[in-house]
Regions:
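AAA+ P-loop ATPase motor domain of ring mechanoenzymes
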Residues: 1-131
Length: 131
């Protein structure tokens, strides 16, 4: 690394796993913290496709209960839209599709979640959770 003359941009979501000697060789380290509730609310609203009616979607609940990065929120919405389309729900995105996609994203991240975290939407996923 010391002999490299170009610009290198490195990204990780596991900084604590990086060796201190490696970190000392980096000239600049910029941290991007997870978005807060207000930022997540804006992200949830902004990633819903324009063709989708957001009327039944509880963005406030999603932003408050699930501390996720923007990329994870975008992946959740994408997956929920695919699932809805697969089930024939034309341009209709439901909270059930979203909370199932949230659970799927938490599973991918190997992040623990509880039915309590899903609040009033817990019955929508209770029968589909992994043991």
């Amino acid at each position: 690394m010391e002999r490299f003359k170009g610009l290198a941009i490195l990204a990780t979501n596991r900084r604590k796993d990086l060796d201190e000697a490696f970190l000392r060789r980096l000239r600049f380290v910029i941290e991007f913290p997870l978005p807060g509730t207000a930022e997540r609310l804006r992200i949830w609203r902004s990633v819903i496709p324009a063709e989708v009616d957001p009327g039944e979607l509880d963005f406030d609940f999603l932003a408050q209960r699930f501390p996720l990065a923007g990329g994870h929120i975008r992946a959740i919405v994408f997956h929920a839209c695919l699932q809805s389309a697969q089930m024939g729900a034309e341009r209709r995105l439901t909270m059930q599709a979203l909370v199932l996609a949230v659970q799927r994203e938490y599973d991918k991240l190997e992040r623990a979640s509880s039915l309590d975290q899903f609040g009033k939407y817990a019955p929508l996923i209770a029968t589909r959770r992994k043991p």
